[in-house]
From Swiss-Prot:
Gene Ontology CC, one term: mitochondrion
Keywords: Meiosis, Mitochondrion, Transit peptide
GO-annotated biological processes: meiotic cell cycle
Keyword Mitochondrion in record: yes
Organism: Schizosaccharomyces pombe (strain 972 / ATCC 24843) (Fission yeast)
The name this protein goes by in its record: Meiotically up-regulated gene 98 protein, mitochondrial
Lineage: Eukaryota, Fungi, Dikarya, Ascomycota, Taphrinomycotina
Subcellular location: Mitochondrion
Major subcellular site: mitochondrion
Functional summary from the UniProt entry: Has a role in meiosis.
């Protein structure tokens, strides 16, 4: 007595589905282009160019050295006072009054770097 074709199909489908679920799929990366900046990859953080409105998204090419620069820390090649914000021990960020006086713009607070 032969097994009905539909039952065979069903079993095959179940087996295929089990195999598919058992298989480890590679992590899916986000699409590598964005609609607003087609040349840039999406996992590179986008640059916000409206600097006068947004102090928190700045270009990576800043005039002052990056935070937590290990080599600079080792060589002591820069002063911490040339940063607009500092991270205190409690984990909060404070504006740096020293930077306001001695930063790239001197006393001109309305000029963004």
């Amino acid at each position: 007595m032969s097994i009905p074709v539909m039952q065979l199909k069903h079993e095959l489908a179940l087996k295929a589905r089990e195999e598919y679920l058992r298989k480890e799929l590679p992590l899916k990366v986000r699409a590598n282009t964005s609609r607003m900046n087609p040349g840039a990859k999406t996992w590179i953080p986008q640059i916000n160019h409206r600097k006068s409105r947004n102090h928190y998204n700045r270009k990576e090419t800043c005039q002052f050295p990056p935070l937590y620069n290990v080599e600079a820390k080792i060589n002591h090649s820069y002063s911490a006072f040339y940063r607009p914000f500092t991270k205190r021990e409690n984990g909060l960020w404070y504006a740096n009054p020293y930077y306001m006086q001695h930063g790239p713009n001197g006393n001109y607070h309305h000029v963004y770097y």
